[in-house]
């Protein structure tokens, strides 16, 4: 089958920089993705786009919902807050959230515990999957277990983090209206990232666990910043130690850092239907891998050993929420790209 006109035009420069055997691997991975509702696929190495393709409803300048892939922005935003002297990962949340101070368990929660999803607070807060609470609703969520004792995936910790950041911005008088305004000023604007949309709650605050919609290229730019240690055009945009901490796991889940998945044996995934944890052992055999992942198999892969960023976006998020990962395999997809 002949490549689409969009693929051909976009791929002209890529062919010049990627050997023919690499292009063949990328084409095979594209076919695998497209057959599973894929609408965008991009490979970047050492900051240069090697392959880029759009199918179906995908377009180069069309943003696509990241679903829970949105979560990984929070870990890097925390590293920017550390650089600005507004936050420490080891600080108690109760320093900023007085609602936590008199609570047996919540008084011991650190910022890192929130972002590791081991705060002791139920991640879903008793809500159905995809139901995001307001900041106030999340802040009222109780804790019934010691901090660090259990991994609990869901939107509640991210919305609590959003309120914590909002209060810090108000106290510091940064001029940022909310966490998204801060994220935009500190990271998105310097990188040239322009979210197409970002969902907000009934309180007017941006959702941090989901809701971002950006282009494949913009997601790749974000991934490249992380691979580069937070340095862009010679300038450090975040605290390097705090960024490194994004990829340090908790004792409760060896496969999750500060908002990033790190597939390895013993990993606890986001849910029984996600398919992520089931491939943790095989994925660990591909080398060092960090991943932002969302429903519908939205993916941002970071492969430090290859200095490579891979973006995959897909249609059918709602369908995925109902039926799980389907026959998608991260291991198969990455093996096609890497020739592993």
Annotate each predicted stretch with a short phrase.
Residues 2, 7-22:
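N-terminal export signals
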Residues 29-59, 300-303, 307-311:
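A short, well-structured edge-of-sheet supersecondary motif
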